[in-house]
Amino acid sequence: GELNDEAEDLHYFGGEILDAYVFANFNVGDVGANVRLCRHTIYWGQSLFLIGSVHSVGGSMNTFDGIKALSVPGSEARELFRPTNKLSTVIQLSDSFTVEAYASFEWENIRIPEATTFFSAADILYEDYEMFLLTVAPAFPGFDGPVGIGLETQDDEYSDSGEWGVNFSYYFENSGLEVSAYYLYYNSKVQDGKIGVINAAQGLTVGFFDEQIRALGLDPEPIKAAFGEAPDVVSAELGQVSIGKYKWMYKEDVDLYGLSFSKDLGGISLGLDLTHRRNTPLRSNTTQVVQSAFDNYPAPLAPVLEANFGPEFDFDGADGANYPRVPVGNTFPAVFNGVGFLTDTGIWQGGSYAFELVLAYLDEVTQGEELLMSTPTISLEEGDTSSNLALAFNPTWYQVFPGVDLTLRTSANIGLHGSAPNGLGGDEEVGLGTIGLEASVNQLWSADIRYNFFFGPQRNEIGAQWKDRDNISLTFKRTF
């Protein structure tokens, strides 16, 4: 089949300019400073890989390229981050004390593979998707209507301004320990929040509320007839009707407080990030969120509908700043990692290895606890913890051919325990990995061939959907 227009635009546009900024270096007395303006990336914290960065500081500051993350498993987080327009500065107050700050004036959500492409995920993730199908909820007893409900997409607008952060770093020369303290005020880039609303008047015509009407001693048919025909059938074969609308929202005004520590110990560069997020979006039960909100109550039924389903929901007024009916709370993630270099053992001549352990704790749900993710395989609640492990092992052989070095590229990422409270934070037993060979020619050109694989239970959650997408990739790169 053919790719849709959005897929062709994203996957076949030929190239793009990433970093494009102006900068200045100057001194004020004995204090050195650097300032950058326009499209660039800054990356605080110690996280190495994607899951670690999602839970740490770097993934909160930046959006990232999910297409590359899937195409090249094991990519370091800094290779996935995408630049946005911002103003940033680094001020070197002394040899040991550094202050950094930034203010962003461009917001961009994460880039995911478009629909109809090899790595495309659930269609509902795309803003151009037209229908979201729901099974009939137990809240509508006796309903004998279509097998699903289609809801029309209504896109939302997001603020490009308001994100900022500050970083204080101190290097203890005697111990070789660097300590950093962070504060970020940011907007989520991950699709954690979806809200929808069912048009109650339309729902009435297709029989949603028959049981509630009969409970009042009334005949639903004359009442339904007063509101005209049922909505047009979107799919005659499936009997789906469009009786509502939904949209994605990205939570604004999230607070992050963080500490990080880094030190070389025994030839290994160790890093630790401890963060606390307040007012952060949590993973939600999408079906329950959408089919438990209504607008356009028919006047004769308004009292009974309000008694059963609550007041009418202001769908159009909801956005990232006014974030109703989506779970929000506070979390405590921790990221611990290490990077080391391989020495000549006779089996290999050099190379590197890395590990990253991620822990996440759901401390408090401050809004929408009843709407937290709840499926047969994932059920979140306050006090839950999750863990995730990433490993990379890359031995190298030098001058295998004149000017050619070979490196074996291996990496894997797996959810060890539980499910993360935030989107893309990892799920138990779900993971991905890669094994391949990279040839570097004169340290300028490289060719990389890999077998990339995905594993874990076949489930509906994001991440498990790529279990059947194992592939072989070939990459050429030129360094300037």
Predicted regions and their residues:
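Outer membrane beta-barrel
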Residues: 1-123, 388, 417, 426-431, ...
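Solvent-exposed loop segments that connect transmembrane elements
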Residues: 2-6, 54-72, 115-152, 191-246, ...
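Short loop/turn motifs that connect adjacent beta-strands in outer-membrane beta-barrel proteins
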Residues: 23-35, 44-48, 96-99, 112, ...
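Outer-membrane beta-barrel "beta-signal"
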Residues: 467-480
